């Protein structure tokens, strides 16, 4: 351990020596360029800037163009571009050197790292926007008691599941350092289990959405007989034993790295991924049947309930592919092509992080019942405040001189 600081010091001294040798060679090269050039009159002397670019002897008032350096501090640059510097009219070099066109040539590893950082930013931005929209939608469903029915309670629980999933995503990102991954402590495994549980609940609540619509539209079963506890058992209850079984499998067969990722040849993750794919496929079948019925039997129907079903189906038609595409992308190999891999990373990051935003928009903000209830509340608030204003104005009108106040009567009786 004691030798490492000494080695670092030796390396630093060697680099310093090499840099000074390189700088002296550049100065000599710059002077030789200046001697070779024939410049008469007022001129700028040969100079090497901080980036190591040689600016040869040049006439005053001229913009000097020099190619970018091949290497600078170990970084390779594109030499087809140029740097610019002005030789001022008084024969001195301008302090500012324009190297904006000199772009570094990144290796494949550096490019992948840059794309990864951009994908992380997209993920953070998307999850922040999604969480904000989901919280607003949650509060609206909480406050608007007039629209509470089984259908909207399912929407509300789906939004709650997405809130919890987004919240645990932030916990994972902020706590799971490489050191924690390697230590495989108990709390980090619990965080992973919680994140996967809420991930599964998203799919089972989407299954609840499809199940409700299929029961109401295809089976023509009275929705009044449907109870919210049935859907609560499906959405929150069924995923729990699935995750418990997955956690037991991880504990015995793949107990490393906080249960993130998987060991080659171990398929414990399919314990929870399998049911997710299954309910996704069932939902696609439900949607196919629902759309078929709506297109044939209920096309001419104009009842308010049928209109609500159509709107719910439209929202589900949009959201289910969004949920499904992001999960099916997990099994897709983007290939070795650089462009396809970059597109895959960005596309998956965008859809994965903005899912909650789309759910809140389609099931809450564009929900006609929610919007109607908000308008009614707004009108009631306006009416209430206008009545208060009228009462306040009436109370502020001065009393007539002919009226006698109680205070004056009391004074006269006292006399």
From Swiss-Prot:
Its main location: membrane. PROSITE patterns: G_PROTEIN_RECEP_F2_2 (PS00650), G_PROTEIN_RECEP_F2_3 (PS50227), G_PROTEIN_RECEP_F2_4 (PS50261). PANTHER family: CORTICOTROPIN-RELEASING FACTOR RECEPTOR 1, PDF RECEPTOR-LIKE PROTEIN-RELATED. Residues 280-290 are annotated as: Important for antagonist binding. Residues 24-111, 175-189, 254-269, 332-338 are extracellular. It is a multi-pass membrane protein. Residues 99-108 are annotated as: Important for peptide agonist binding. Disulfide bonds join 30-54, 44-87, 68-102, 188-258. This is Corticotropin-releasing factor receptor 1. Belongs to the G-protein coupled receptor 2 family. The gene is CRHR1. Glycans are attached at residues 38, 45, 51, 78, 90, 98. The modification Phosphoserine is found at residue 301. It comes from the Eukaryota. It comes from Ovis aries (Sheep).
């Amino acid at each position: 351990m004691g030798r490492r600081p000494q080695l670092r010091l030796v390396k630093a001294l060697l680099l310093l020596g090499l840099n000074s040798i390189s700088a002296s060679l550049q100065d000599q090269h710059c002077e030789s360029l200046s001697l070779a050039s024939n410049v008469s009159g007022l001129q700028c002397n040969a100079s090497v800037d901080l980036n190591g670019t040689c600016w040869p002897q040049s006439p005053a008032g001229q913009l000097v163009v020099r190619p970018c350096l091949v290497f600078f501090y170990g970084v390779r640059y594109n030499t087809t571009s140029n740097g610019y510097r002005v030789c001022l009219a008084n024969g001195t070099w301008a302090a500012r050197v324009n190297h904006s066109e000199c772009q570094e040539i990144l290796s494949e590893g550096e490019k992948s790292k840059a794309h990864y950082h951009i994908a992380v930013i997209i993920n953070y931005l998307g999850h922040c926007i999604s969480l904000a929209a989901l919280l607003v939608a949650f509060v609206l469903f909480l406050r608007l008691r007039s629209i509470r029915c089984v259908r909207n309670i399912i929407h509300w629980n789906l939004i709650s599941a997405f809130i919890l999933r987004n919240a645990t995503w932030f916990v994972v990102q902020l706590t799971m350092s490489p050191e924690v991954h390697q230590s495989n402590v108990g709390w980090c495994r619990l965080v992973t289990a919680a994140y996967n549980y809420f991930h599964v609940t998203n799919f089972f609540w989407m299954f609840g959405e499809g199940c409700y619509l299929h029961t109401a539209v295809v089976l023509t079963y009275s929705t009044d007989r449907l109870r919210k506890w049935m859907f609560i058992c499906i959405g929150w209850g069924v995923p729990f034993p699935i995750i418990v079984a997955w956690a037991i499998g991880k504990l015995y067969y793949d107990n490393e790295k906080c249960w993130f990722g998987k060991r080659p040849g171990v398929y414990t993750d399919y314990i929870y991924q399998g049911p997710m794919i299954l309910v996704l496929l069932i939902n696609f079948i439900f949607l196919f049947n629902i759309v078929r019925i709506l297109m044939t039997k209920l096309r001419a129907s104009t009842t308010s309930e049928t209109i609500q079903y159509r709107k719910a189906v439209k929202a589900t038609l949009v959201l289910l592919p969004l949920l499904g595409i992001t999960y099916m992308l997990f099994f897709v190999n983007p290939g070795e092509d650089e462009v396809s891999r970059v597109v895959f990373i960005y596309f998956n990051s965008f859809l994965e992080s903005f899912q909650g935003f789309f759910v809140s928009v389609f099931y809450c903000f564009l929900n006609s019942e929610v919007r109607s209830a908000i308008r009614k509340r707004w009108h009631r608030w306006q009416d209430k405040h206008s009545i208060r204003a009228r009462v306040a104005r009436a109370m502020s009108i001065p009393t007539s001189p002919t009226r006698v106040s109680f205070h004056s009567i009391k004074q006269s009786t006292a006399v």
